[in-house]
């Protein structure tokens, strides 16, 4: 009984500590100024108009269905709703934590909705997998606030796990392939700069 009470108090304190009464500069905040919900669904949009639309999937190469993560060429498209999840038990994404990103409505041939990074002719690229993945292969992203922006704009870091540490020293950017697909790839230059727009619940149904 005591252990149950202690656990309940611990969870309550964790929830209260992440209530959105105020935000700090390093909090992960959406386009409307609200803290980003852990497990919530959002559109990842360019903060500068005319740089393309939101993030979606495309079928490339010999893929049986759209497994390549790309930016929509349609500037008025929000793309697909994306779930943002942390490994921590909290209502909101903890500051500076690694996150998993996954499509709320993934394609049928994907074994998992979560993004991962795989080798490709264009270099390491963001894809969906046809196989189940371990946690270390999906908790590989981190949002970094753009310091020169006075609004909530973020770069997306790619993080690699080794035996003792996690290294986050590369970014996610865009590579346009010969078919015009704006693929998300790992890069050290010209990272994506994104704003997070909360998706409506009826649009972002979970599979």
Swiss-Prot record:
It comes from the Eukaryota. GO terms for molecular function: serine-type endopeptidase inhibitor activity. Keywords: Disulfide bond, Protease inhibitor, Serine protease inhibitor, Signal. InterPro entries: Kunitz_inhibitor_STI-like_sf, Prot_inh_Kunz-lg. Residues 1-24 form the signal peptide. It holds the Pfam family Kunitz_legume. Disulfide bonds join 65-109, 159-168. The record marks 89-90 as: Reactive bond for chymotrypsin. Inhibits alpha-chymotrypsin at the molar ratio of 1:2 in state of 1:1. PANTHER family: KUNITZ TRYPSIN INHIBITOR 2 (PTHR33107), TRYPSIN INHIBITOR A (PTHR33107:SF81). Belongs to the protease inhibitor I3 (leguminous Kunitz-type inhibitor) family. This is Chymotrypsin inhibitor 3. It comes from Psophocarpus tetragonolobus (Winged bean).
């Amino acid at each position: 009984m005591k252990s149950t009470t202690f656990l309940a108090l611990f969870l309550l304190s964790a929830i209260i500590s992440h209530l959105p009464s105020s935000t700090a500069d390093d909090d992960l905040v959406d386009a409307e100024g609200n803290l980003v919900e852990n497990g919530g669904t959002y559109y990842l949009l360019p903060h500068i108009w005319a740089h393309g639309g939101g993030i979606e999937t495309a079928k490339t190469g010999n893929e049986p269905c759209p497994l390549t993560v790309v930016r929509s060429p349609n500037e008025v498209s929000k793309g697909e709703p994306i779930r943002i999840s942390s490994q921590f038990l909290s209502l909101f994404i903890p500051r500076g934590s690694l996150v998993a990103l996954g499509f709320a409505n993934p394609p049928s041939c994907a074994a998992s909705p979560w993004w991962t990074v795989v080798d490709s002719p264009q270099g390491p690229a963001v894809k969906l997998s046809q196989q189940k993945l371990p946690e270390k292969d999906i908790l590989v992203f981190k949002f970094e606030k753009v310091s020169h922006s006075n609004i909530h704009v973020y770069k997306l870091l790619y993080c690699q796990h080794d035996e003792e540490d996690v290294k986050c020293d590369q970014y996610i950017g865009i590579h346009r392939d010969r078919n015009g697909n704006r693929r998300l790839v790992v890069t050290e230059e010209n990272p994506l700069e994104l704003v997070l727009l909360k998706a409506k619940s009826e649009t972002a149904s979970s599979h």
